[in-house]
Amino acid sequence: MTASFKAVMIGGVRWYQQRISANTPPCCKYYPTCSNYAIEALERYGAFKGGVLAVLRLLRCRPWSRGGIDDVPQRYSIFYRFSWSKAHEEPRLTPLATTQREAQR
């Protein structure tokens, strides 16, 4: 049940990317974009936990936010951006995928 719900949620995000987002100019302040973040969070943590992270990301994406690189956390925590959290991760200057590729060289 959870896997099928996850697939439905990912399908909804992909539908948004193809039908709505494709017809508007790029305006996301974050990398990866909010929709790509949602897909990665859903794939990594499932429908419920990934959905929670996606909603929290959408709440952070507002006109007065700084934006920047905001990868899906390596360990699940809704508090990963707070310094007092055990799962705290500092925002990166380079995307995580780039950092991992350079480490493999």
UniProtKB/Swiss-Prot annotation:
Example of a GO cellular component annotation carried by this entry: plasma membrane
Pfam families the record matches: YidD
Membrane topology according to the record: Peripheral membrane protein
Keyword check for rRNA-binding: no
Principal subcellular localization: membrane
Subcellular locations according to the entry: Cell membrane
Coiled coil: none
Keywords, sorted A to Z: Cell membrane, Membrane
NCBIfam families xrefs: membrane protein insertion efficiency factor YidD
Family in the record: Belongs to the UPF0161 family.
Role played: Could be involved in insertion of integral membrane proteins into the membrane.
Name under which the protein is recorded: Putative membrane protein insertion efficiency factor
